[in-house]
């Protein structure tokens, strides 16, 4: 019996070691926070020019892809990002490292009730609740050149959690951009294969890497 338990423990350690998400800041997740209506100049999200990249890790490898944005707005007060929100088209989920039938099969699998259940939850949303300057003296970040720390409510598959992560925010003329690279624990939003306690889910890393590249232009109206 001891040999069996030892073998199981060793196998578990091997599985975990092969499921490491890309090195990035780990976004802290807390309960949903109240949003405030920021006042200032509105900037319309450039859905065509913005992307959210993702990397999922499993035993033996990784897959990567993208989500597209539907719409959204950033609000700037005195030239600084103060608030905003954007909608994510979850049904746009694409797998970029596969082609042909393998690509279609994995995309269908991820969009099904096994994970994102896009037929019931086709849209995710991120609402900014706080933006503060990044203090390199008291904080560290794997994102080189981080300028701000952003917090916001992320609603995914009907679950809302507040996440905090470093970002690079740039305001240039009539445009603004926000770039971030961080990992989240997918189980906080109920994303698990056949349930969190199913052995099939153990082969998939809980942490998913997200790469945000969101652009917006000053609204003309």
Regions found by a protein language model. Give the residues of each.
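Low-complexity, acidic/polar, glycine-enriched regions of mature
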Residues: 18-221
